[in-house]
């Protein structure tokens, strides 16, 4: 047994150079585990076109070998974990690729396990499951890099930039340099410090201060990369990205730490930012980077700005500036551009941290512009983003208890800028209604109505390469995997997800219904079944209670921006026709006129008209209205106000920073359409609208909506009985054994039947 010591992330990697067994009685036939890929990104795809983990076997002999019925395993305790199909052969000097994706349903050469990125064992056993033929213990792997035998160096294991399935491995790196040590962790600072960086094993540190990655695998060093020679003075807001480098070794993973100095943030300056290389225009319209001195220097707010910046979590994005702002390829300067696959997605580092004991994480992922009308730069300078977690960036999921909910693994997240009812909007009426919590409130409400998958989220301050970008919402996105996780089904089961009605197609692609996951087939089936008004089948393919709750919410909140092709989402279907569920999405035009009896589109889904013609559906609808709007239900006045106050408290101080960043945009930077143009501030505008909703909207809205539903024939004029337990109002819940239930008739006449 030979030991090869590779310092990979501080761990010892043991490679077993076994006295390999001769196969099939031939003295010349030997089978090796030749190469593995544990993180994808190498351009090798399976029959479904997906980049999966894989294991390559190599027959070093001259004669063919039958490897059928041999075993592959990633667990020493279970040597017979996956059996190679009978009759599988490797010809002399040939190779066999086996997909280690954990999904045997994808094909005969798909093993029932996947390879761990942090390292594990891979073993090949003979047909008896006892005799070990070959084995490799590997350490932490890198995206797009394989681990294989270098046959020009005696078959030692090395890291290789070029995957060579079906061919002999050549060259490679001796090991991976360990991660860079930072003397100070990301976070908030008031006083400057000397940042020390270090790496063991004889390597040296390369770093950047402009957000770009100092090193790209296969791409070399960044043009702005510097060699660390001594402590770095950090006395202003700064993003430091560093990598360990050593000749002949694969560089370490890039480490990223953002250091925020609140007193520096409030002095964020337009001229200095442009002088640093940022563009003065975004898509032909004036760029704005400044924190407005009229807010930061105002005695009312100056003393509260530091606390405002620390009051909610911070999300820091770091990337090459060109990825965001290049005139041709930047996603922010080309917000209307959409392409296939990853064409308009850019690699970034994301850090999430808090001044308190809140979330703390860093992950590399993809960033893209998100939205419809909000992408138009003349309508809003502040764009929403989507975060995508993929193996090509390092991790296929964000594994973190982000929202204190049941879902702790994410393939995507939403960074919502808030387009409608925001201080940057082109319409003066909407600017005066800015609250930055309406969409949160809608999603919270759907959850409280009994829909735990209703998209959890919280507010964050966003920074891009150290530049404060404003107040954003970070929340779940209703993807296929989101549906699977919340409904307890296998994450690999095909599920469909849609953004608006995909059968609704108009000339504007950004506001046309789209399939975001899967196919349109199950959605077409749902619409067909509903059109036939087959109540029995409808209940199988539609989560009726969820659809009713979603509909009631949109009517109650007066969602005047509900459209056929956008501003709502749904998921379900798939080959097994899972029940479709609906989600509040882009609920920004709500809680405006308390007396309104209109929404954007009465039947945005194309389902409601047929459903409400079914007596059983109307009865269920009335039951859900009563559940939510009476007896301290989720839509009772007290519960509505409680949710609103909770979200208001969350951003109460944070909106001061948003005001300084964007409150002057329409007055001072880009006047569009009509005025009046104000400097929008917390006390004058945000507080006034907040109090209007509390004092004028919620107190009367229930009566307005109940009359509306009654006029639509969806709620009876007769009041429901009032339940009491031992003389106290109680509708549901636990009671003591032997308690006395009484039912009172609130109507002037009639009887109660039960």
Residue ranges and their predicted role:
Residues 2-14:
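Bacterial N-terminal signal peptides that target proteins for export
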Residues 13-23:
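Bacterial N-terminal signal peptides
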Residues 27-159:
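Activation on beta-sandwich/Ig-like modules and their edge loops
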Residues 29-32, 88-92, 98, 141-339, ...:
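Short, compositionally stereotyped local motifs that mark structural "simplifiers"
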Residues 317, 387, 540-596, 698:
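Active-site acidic catalytic loop and adjacent metal/ATP-binding pocket
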Residues 369-421:
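Conserved oxyanion/phosphate-binding beta-strand-loop segments in alpha/beta enzyme cores
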Residues 400-434, 467, 473-557, 620:
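ATP-dependent phospho-/nucleotidyl transfer catalytic cores
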Residues 574-710:
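C-terminal catalytic region of ATP-dependent kinase domains
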């Amino acid at each position: 047994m030979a030991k090869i010591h590779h310092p990979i992330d501080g761990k010892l990697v043991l490679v077993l150079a076994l006295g390999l067994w001769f196969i099939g009685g031939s003295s010349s036939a030997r089978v090796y585990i030749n190469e593995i890929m544990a993180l994808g990104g190498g351009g090798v795809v399976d029959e479904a076109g997906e980049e999966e983990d894989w294991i390559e076997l190599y027959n070093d002999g001259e004669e063919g070998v039958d490897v059928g019925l041999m075993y592959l395993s990633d667990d020493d305790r279970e040597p017979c974990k996956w059996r190679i199909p009978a009759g599988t052969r490797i010809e002399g000097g040939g190779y066999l690729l086996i997909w280690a994706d954990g999904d045997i349903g994808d094909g005969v050469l798909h093993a029932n396990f996947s390879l761990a990125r942090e390292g594990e064992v891979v073993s090949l056993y003979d047909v008896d499951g006892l005799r070990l033929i070959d084995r490799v213990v590997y350490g932490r792997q890198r995206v797009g890099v394989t681990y294989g035998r270098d046959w020009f160096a005696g078959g030692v294991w090395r890291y290789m930039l070029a995957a060579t399935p079906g061919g002999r491995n050549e060259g490679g790196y001796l090991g991976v340099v360990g991660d860079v040590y930072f003397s100070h962790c990301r976070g908030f600072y008031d006083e400057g410090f000397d940042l020390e960086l270090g790496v063991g094993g004889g390597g040296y540190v390369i770093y950047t201060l402009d957000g770009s990655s100092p090193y790209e695998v296969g791409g070399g060093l960044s043009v702005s990369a510097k060699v660390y020679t001594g402590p770095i003075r950090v006395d202003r807001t700064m993003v430091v990205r560093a990598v360990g480098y050593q000749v002949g070794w694969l560089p370490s993973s890039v480490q990223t730490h953002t250091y925020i100095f609140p007193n520096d943030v409030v002095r964020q300056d337009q001229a200095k930012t442009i002088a640093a290389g940022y563009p003065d225009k975004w898509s032909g319209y004036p760029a704005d980077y400044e924190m407005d001195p009229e807010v930061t220097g105002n005695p009312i707010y100056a003393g509260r700005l530091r606390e405002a910046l620390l009051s909610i979590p911070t999300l820091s994005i770091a990337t090459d500036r060109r990825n965001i702002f290049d005139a041709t390829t930047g996603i922010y300067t080309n917000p209307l551009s959409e392409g296939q696959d990853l064409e308009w997605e850019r690699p970034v580092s994301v850090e999430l941290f808090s001044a308190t004991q809140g979330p703390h994480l860093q992950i590399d992922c993809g960033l893209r512009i998100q939205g419809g009308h909000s992408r138009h730069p003349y309508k809003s300078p502040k764009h929403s983003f989507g975060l995508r977690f993929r193996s090509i960036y390092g991790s296929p999921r964000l594994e973190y208890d982000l929202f204190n909910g049941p879902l702790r693994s994410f393939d995507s997240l939403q960074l919502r800028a808030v387009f409608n009812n925001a201080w940057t909007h082109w319409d003066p009426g909407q600017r005066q209604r800015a609250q930055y919590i309406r969409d949160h409130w809608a999603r919270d409400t759907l959850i409280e109505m009994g829909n735990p998958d209703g998209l959890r989220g919280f507010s964050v301050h966003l920074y891009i390469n150290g530049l404060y970008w404003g107040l954003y919402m970070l929340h779940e996105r209703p993807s296929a995997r989101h549906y699977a996780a919340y409904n307890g089904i296998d994450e690999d089961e095909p599920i469909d997800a849609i953004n608006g009605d995909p059968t609704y197609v108009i000339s504007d692609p950004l506001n046309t219904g789209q399939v975001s996951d899967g196919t349109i087939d199950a959605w077409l089936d749902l619409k067909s079944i509903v059109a036939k008004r087959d109540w029995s089948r409808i209940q199988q393919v539609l989560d009726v209670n969820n659809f009713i709750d979603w509909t009631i919410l949109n009517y109650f909140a007066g969602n005047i921006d509900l459209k056929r092709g956008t501003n709502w989402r749904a998921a379900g279907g798939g080959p097994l026709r899972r029940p479709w569920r609906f989600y509040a999405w882009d609920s920004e035009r709500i809680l405006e006129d308390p007396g309104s009896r209109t929404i954007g589109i009465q039947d945005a889904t194309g389902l409601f008209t047929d459903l409400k013609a079914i007596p059983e559906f109307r009865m269920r609808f009335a039951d859900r209205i009563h559940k939510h709007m009476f007896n301290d239900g989720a839509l009772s006045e007290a519960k509505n106000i409680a949710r609103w106050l909770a979200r208001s408290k969350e951003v109460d101080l944070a909106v001061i920073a948003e005001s300084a960043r964007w409150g002057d945009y329409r007055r001072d930077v880009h006047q569009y359409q009509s005025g009046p143009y104000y400097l929008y501030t917390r006390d004058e505008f945000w507080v006034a609208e907040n109090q209007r909703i509390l004092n004028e909207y919620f107190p009367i809205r229930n009566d307005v909506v109940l009359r509306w539903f009654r006029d639509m024939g969806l709620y009876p004029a007769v009041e429901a009985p009032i339940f009491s337990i031992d003389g106290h109002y109680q509708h549901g819940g636990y009671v003591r054994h032997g308690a006395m239930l009484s039912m009172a008739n609130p109507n002037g006449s009639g009887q109660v039947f039960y």
